[in-house]
Amino acid sequence: MYVPMKAVNAKEGTITFDDEDGTEMTLPLTGGNVKLQWKPDFGARWAALDVDFEMYGKDHSTNTPIYDSICRILGSRPPEHFTYELFLDQDGHKISKSSGNGLTIDEWLTYASAESLSYFMYLKPKTAKRMYFDVIPKAVDEYHQQLRAYETQDDKGKLNNPVWHIHGGDVPKSDMVVPFSMLLNLASVSSAEDKSQLWGFIQRYAPDATPEGNPGMDAAAEHAVRYYNDFVKPAKVFRAPSELEREALEDLRDQLKTWDGGLDAEALQTMVFAVGKERFDPLRDWFTALYEVLLGASQGPRFGGFIALYGVDETVALIDDALAGKLTTA
């Protein structure tokens, strides 16, 4: 209710006004009896609670001088301010409840950890960021990269690392032996419906890893299966290889058939690189072909690492299926 004040008794801490039906009312200001308009509420709250730091979105920035003035009038010093930019949708539009174009916290947590969300929100607060489902895998992998980097940093580096602030200085170790983006690719080629399918690949690549000993990895495997089925699977589009791509894929397959280098991801990557370098300029066209023909995606992981995780024999079979046209009709 917005009504004019008939009387203000500063000594007694009361106000007098006419109610909606014309009845004169006198109420104490305390005890939750009254509420300020939102603009003066900022400055009054700062003064009453001795606030020394306030973060808020840029939509409040134009009113900051008003908030500060009210705080000073009430005899207090305004706090230090930090204004952050707003989140945008994938098309660069402002997120709003009415348009339903937002990504909610619950939706993020369906596919990734709370820490990955904290990491995403921490980065570049003064830059407007697009927040939609496709940014989740990158945020997860970058968060774990920072966890691993933290272990080798000096004190200054640790203080500048986002994970120090996310965890309040008590930073855990990453137990992700496989990147989240790689888990998504594994889920894709194996059509995984359950995280146990992914653990078969994970434990071949990292035999000491277990769901019990690597709870973060286990949660990520479950998130990856869920994310794959909800977002990747409906959008997968395989294409047939060109003649040049077919020749390169046959060469890669034949070299893999005689491969005796174990599951060394770097050695496998070197071989994949060499096959492409003989035929493609620019070389990225080769890797794009691998992703589009074998994974049904426009981008993907370091392919040597993928082979090491998925398996050499399995990759040979995958290439054979692609060359036979089985993937484009799947």
Protein language model annotation of sequence segments:
Residues 59, 64, 84-226, 295-329:
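Catalytic adenosine-cofactor/nucleotide-binding cores of aminoacyl-tRNA synthetases and other
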